[in-house]
């Protein structure tokens, strides 16, 4: 059954500044009407603070809102063998934590978001694909006895784009591996979200609804900062200017994407992931209200 939820990432600015606690953030997005919540550990660490892990479980039970996914940044590429082993051990700790919290899925990246743009070529991707595949297979094998499904999100500028993501998904031969389809992130590699969603929805276990303003490379809006997707304009791999927006106020046809998701047979969780420059609680609230309305309209 489809559940409409919110990623805590949308209000993580206030967590990182200490304006609200992680539990207060969870409570706020539950009060916005989320049927399920995604945890993203920006401003907190559940592996290092077991008491906070308990607090989240208690808050989830008290409010009647489950935690459906845990989203973890990771990087397994361009590392020494020692650093690769350390990263694998770190991610496995987070898989253990996900199991302890009875969260069914964990999103794990293969490449760093801030990886140099010159290293994001198709030639480099094809060179690194065997390592990406073996990494996810090891993570899936570790996660399976714990009942956890590992998710690949189209995130960043390397393991992104419908063709690259499809290649990874079809190469990893594990039944507890799937796709977290992020509508907005496809624009980071100049993939067309409305078309990418149609290509990739059959692989999706969860969906991120996210919107961006888009400006062509020759129309510099000013203030762009490389890799800063939260507080400014930034650029795609081919120079398109991108800026996060309130859902349905940007340039992605959210109605078209939502129709694709709704009538595809998808029956997982749809999370609002707000990444705009507005005050983050306001931006998350309006975006989630729009997401619910559009889901019912299409």
Where are these regions (language model features)?
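Conserved, mostly hydrophobic/aromatic
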Residues: 6, 29, 37, 60, ...
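Acidic-and-aromatic substrate-binding clefts and catalytic sites of carbohydrate-active enzymes
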Residues: 13-19, 40-52, 75-85, 114-118, ...
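Catalytic domains of carbohydrate-active enzymes, especially glycoside hydrolases
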Residues: 21-42, 101-102
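Boundary/entry segment of secreted carbohydrate-active catalytic domains
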Residues: 1-21
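C-terminal helical cap(s) of enzyme catalytic domains, especially alpha/beta-barrels
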Residues: 281-298
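A structural motif
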Residues: 34, 98, 103, 204, ...
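Active-site acidic/histidine proton-transfer and metal-coordination neighborhood
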Residues: 15, 27, 55-66, 80-179, ...
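Acidic/histidine-rich catalytic cores of soluble enzymes
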Residues: 19, 36-37, 67-70, 133-251
